[in-house]
């Protein structure tokens, strides 16, 4: 009795059914068990057994019914409700009532496919009439010659009801829509996606030949298969190619049959084997002999899409220096491509005020070009002025050279006259020759000083010299004075050749002479003075620039009447001429 009550209390707890499986799941079994327990425990009477059986029977339907199952109990143990699970997960429906009812098959004659809402378009259906070899030839022609892909070529063939000739003839009439993405397009899309994200309008700026719909379509197909790092993906593919070439067992890396861990282990093993082989083949001497090449390879900057603060500063300075010359700016930054620089400019033009920087660059460039255009006429004018100035100076130098040549010629002629005259004189005049030579030497010195002064004055005033040379030819006054006395008084011949010069030239001539004389007297006292001082015999005659007057032409004539007539030598001529051609005076000395 006690055991039966305990069992009933375990089954029913405060009016709730136990979570665990009930020991009295079946009624008959429960009654039998309880009866046996009670019978074994107490044999006093049948009334207690009846009450126990009633209690047991009343508790059994609540504890466990035939409708409940272990699945329901397991569901509640897991904390899941029936509403969250479909009825097909709870029980297996088997029987006629749970099968789908198929409609009867409609004959082909009664079918109306145009009345159906959802219809598929058949683009290809294989046939046995065309052999595989001809079909492959047709597809290759469509690909290589007309740019079709395999599906488009087969669709054209099916459109013409498997007629190869008509399909080949019709291939040229249609241009297939190229929706293929090349490797360059894919790389550009990845870079643009890293910069702009899902802003397809900005991505289209880097891929102008693609439409927005094509970009969106490719994005969703690329999103499913892309990896976190495309650079690592390319490196992994390169390693796979190396491993496949160097693997001895020929097994493919990363097969679907192996797990991820086995795949990684196999990759690492094969990479290690390949590296071991490379290490064995490396020659240490060659590596040591070429350290510079290794350094240059390692020193090459790595292209990165991420902009560091230093790179931003360099880019701003380069934009200020080169404007919108993006290739040059990319070379300056050295870690960015032209596309990176262009994108940086577009994204940060407001943040860093890049438009204003470019305007300043263009304004400075225009100013430089304008300055160059202005300097070119100035240089031409300066060159023309130099050429014009060189012409008078050349004329002055030419006139000075001609005047010097005239002076030299007249000096030589006078010297020749002196030599002939000295030969005609008696031999008793030989002791006086050194004095005559000294006088001639000083005349040459005076001529040299005159020439220097003339060149200096013409150089200092080039324009005045040019005007003077244009208005008047180079003038030269030649005065030949012949001292004719008796044999006791030595006759000396002083030849003075002066050129028409400015006051500077005349002052220079006067400074070279120690004792200039305006008149020549024939007294014996002056002759003796000339013998004692030969320089006094040199007459400095300066011709003025405006008048061209002769210096004391009448006064310079020697009064020869003092000497006796018997002692005078044959008559000699004294010629005085000016270079201007205005007057030529000849004097006859008796």
Curated annotation (Swiss-Prot):
Phosphoserine PTM sites in chain numbering: 18, 22, 34, 36, 68-69, 414, 560
Subcellular localization(s) per the UniProt record: Nucleus
Annotated Low complexity bias: 39-53, 378-404, 503-524, 532-543
BP GO terms, sorted: negative regulation of DNA-templated transcription; negative regulation of transcription by RNA polymerase II; regulation of transcription by RNA polymerase II; transposable element silencing by piRNA-mediated heterochromatin formation
Keyword terms of this UniProt record: Chromatin regulator, Coiled coil, Nucleus, Phosphoprotein, Repeat, Repressor, Transcription, Transcription regulation
Residues modified to Phosphothreonine: 25, 65, 375, 411
Molecular-function GO terms, alphabetical: chromatin binding; transcription corepressor activity
Chain spans, region Disordered: 1-90, 244-266, 364-432, 503-590
Stretches assigned to the SANT domain: 176-227, 302-353
Coiled coil: 256-283
Record field: compositional bias (Polar residues): 21-37, 411-423
Keyword presence, Nucleus: yes
Self-association state and partner proteins as the record states: Component of a complex that contains at least HDAC1/Rpd3, CoRest and Su(var)3-3/Hdm. Interacts with neuronal repressor ttk/Ttk88.
Family, similarity comment: Belongs to the CoREST family.
Role of this protein: Essential component of a corepressor complex that represses transcription of neuron-specific genes in non-neuronal cells. The BHC complex is recruited by Ttk88 and probably acts by deacetylating and demethylating specific sites on histones, thereby acting as a chromatin modifier. May serve as a molecular beacon for the recruitment of molecular machinery that imposes silencing across a chromosomal interval.
Listed name of the protein: REST corepressor
Gene name of the record: CoRest
């Amino acid at each position: 009795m006690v055991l039966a009550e305990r069992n009933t209390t375990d089954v029913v707890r405060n009016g709730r059914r136990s979570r665990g499986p009930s020991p009295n799941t079946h009624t008959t079994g429960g009654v039998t068990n309880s009866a046996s327990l009670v019978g074994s425990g107490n044999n006093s009477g049948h009334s207690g057994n009846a009450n126990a059986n009633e209690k047991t029977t009343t508790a059994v339907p609540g504890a466990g019914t035939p409708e409940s199952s272990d699945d329901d109990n397991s569901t509640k143990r897991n904390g899941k409700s029936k509403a969250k699970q479909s009825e097909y997960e709870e029980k297996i429906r088997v029987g006629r009532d749970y099968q789908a009812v198929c409609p009867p098959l409609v004959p082909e004659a009664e079918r109306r496919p145009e009345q159906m809402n959802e219809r598929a378009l058949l683009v290809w259906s294989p046939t046995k009439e065309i052999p595989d070899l001809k079909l492959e030839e047709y597809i290759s022609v469509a690909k290589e010659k007309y740019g079709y892909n395999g599906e488009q070529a087969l669709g054209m063939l099916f459109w013409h009801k498997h007629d190869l000739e008509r399909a080949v003839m019709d291939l040229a009439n249609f241009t297939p829509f190229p929706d293929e993405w090349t490797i360059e397009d894919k790389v550009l899309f990845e870079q643009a996606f890293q910069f702009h994200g899902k802003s397809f309008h900005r991505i289209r700026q880097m891929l102008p030949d693609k439409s927005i719909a094509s970009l969106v379509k490719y994005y969703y197909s690329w999103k499913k298969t892309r990896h976190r790092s495309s650079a690592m993906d390319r490196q992994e593919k390169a390693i796979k190619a190396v491993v496949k070439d160097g693997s001895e067992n020929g097994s493919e890396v990363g097969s679907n049959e192996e797990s991820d861990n086995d795949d990684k282990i196999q990759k690492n093993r094969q990479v290690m084997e390949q590296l071991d082989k490379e290490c064995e083949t490396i020659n240490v001497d060659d590596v040591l002999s070429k350290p510079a090449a290794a350094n240059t390879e390692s020193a090459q900057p790595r292209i990165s899409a991420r902009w560091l603060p230093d790179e931003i500063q360099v880019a701003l300075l380069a934009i200020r220096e080169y404007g919108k010359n993006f290739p040059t700016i990319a070379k300056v930054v050295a870690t960015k491509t032209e596309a990176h620089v262009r994108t940086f400019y577009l994204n940060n033009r407001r943040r860093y005020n890049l438009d204003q920087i470019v305007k300043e660059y263009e304004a400075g460039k225009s100013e430089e070009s304008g300055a160059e255009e202005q300097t070119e006429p100035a240089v031409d004018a300066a060159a023309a002025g130099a050429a014009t100035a060189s012409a008078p100076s050349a004329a002055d130098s030419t006139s000075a050279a001609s005047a010097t040549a005239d002076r030299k010629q007249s000096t030589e002629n006078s010297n020749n006259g002196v030599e002939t005259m000295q030969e005609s004189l008696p031999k008793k005049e030989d002791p006086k020759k050194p004095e005559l030579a000294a006088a001639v030497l000083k005349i040459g010195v005076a001529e040299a000083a005159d020439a220097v002064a003339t060149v200096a004055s013409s150089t200092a005033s080039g324009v005045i010299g040019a005007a003077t040379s244009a208005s008047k030819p180079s003038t030269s006054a030649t005065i030949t004075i012949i001292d004719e006395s008796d044999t006791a008084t030595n006759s000396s011949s002083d030849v003075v050749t002066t050129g028409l010069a400015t006051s500077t030239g005349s002052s220079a001539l006067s400074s070279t002479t120690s004792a200039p004389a305006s008149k020549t007297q024939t007294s014996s006292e002056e002759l003796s003075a000339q013998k004692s001082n030969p320089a006094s015999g040199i007459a400095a005659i300066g011709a003025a620039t405006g008048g061209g007057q002769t210096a004391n032409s009448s006064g310079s004539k020697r009064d020869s009447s003092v000497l006796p007539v018997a002692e005078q030598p044959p008559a000699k001529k004294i010629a005085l001429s000016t270079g201007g051609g205005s007057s030529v005076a000849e004097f006859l000395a008796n």
